[in-house]
Amino acid sequence: MSNDMIFGIHAVKAVLATDPVRLIEVFVLKDRQDDRLMPLLTELKDLGITIQHAGRKALDDKAKGASHQGIIARVKPAKQLNEHDLDTILEGSENPLLLILDGVTDPHNLGACLRNADAAGAVAVIIPKDRAAQLTATASKVACGAAEVMPLVRVTNLARTMRALQDKGVWIVGTAGEATHDIYHSKLTGPLAIVMGAEGEGMRRLTRETCDDLIKIPMAGSVSSLNVSVATGICLFEAVRQRQI
């Protein structure tokens, strides 16, 4: 993660709950009294984590303009996951739901997609190592804690990884405006990976050709597309709905 910094109450709480050894020190807005913040600071103190109080300008400088809610933590880098970790992830789920992002380069969108994936119960988010947003502090802040708990798998060859998933029985559906049927008339149950492409460009050709099926979100108004994080949430939760029937 860029600068090994995480911003905001949710992100710090998530690291504290899941991997507290990553926490090095925490910077808190001086004289801030907050019902959400005080219990968190107590937990951090109990673990012996250094807490430094700083003025707003100092925190703003550390956050480089990003919203920080008065708390910033310096952390050790999280473990980097790759295609070799997918076997372990899949073995831990009988009916896995995965999200694949192809060409999503905006950290805000990555963070929002991670949050959507966590809320929908996905077991992992897969992105290519190249032509993809990195897990910056901004992405982590937007993810609202999900970046610290959702496995983010970076792969060298996305199409090859998709074929490996298919060999393990994962059905892969890609979203495309020219698809012949929509998400509400598509089977989204069973082991499943949903592929979302970049806004405007969509999925790359090889990614599209590797999908088992193409689906679309029906659009009733004048706009032709949705923000990728919004579209991701719609697709993931339609899969969640179908799995509960």
UniProtKB/Swiss-Prot annotation:
EC number: 2.1.1.185
Cysteine pairings via disulfide bonds: none
Major subcellular site: cytoplasm
Cellular-component GO terms for this entry: cytosol
Entry's localization field: Cytoplasm
Gene Ontology MF: a single term: rRNA (guanosine-2'-O-)-methyltransferase activity
Keyword presence, Cytoplasm: yes
CDD domains: SpoU-like_RlmB
Keyword Nucleotidyltransferase attached: no
Substrates-to-products reaction catalysed: guanosine(2251) in 23S rRNA + S-adenosyl-L-methionine = 2'-O-methylguanosine(2251) in 23S rRNA + S-adenosyl-L-homocysteine + H(+)
Signal peptide: none
Residues at which S-adenosyl-L-methionine binds: 197, 217, 226
Keyword list, A-Z: Cytoplasm, Methyltransferase, rRNA processing, S-adenosyl-L-methionine, Transferase
Family listed: Belongs to the class IV-like SAM-binding methyltransferase superfamily. RNA methyltransferase TrmH family. RlmB subfamily.
HAMAP family named among the record's database cross-references: 23SrRNA_methyltr_B (MF_01887)
Protein function: Specifically methylates the ribose of guanosine 2251 in 23S rRNA.
Name of the protein described by the UniProt record: 23S rRNA (guanosine-2'-O-)-methyltransferase RlmB
Naturally occurring in which organism (per UniProt): Photobacterium profundum (strain SS9)
Gene: rlmB
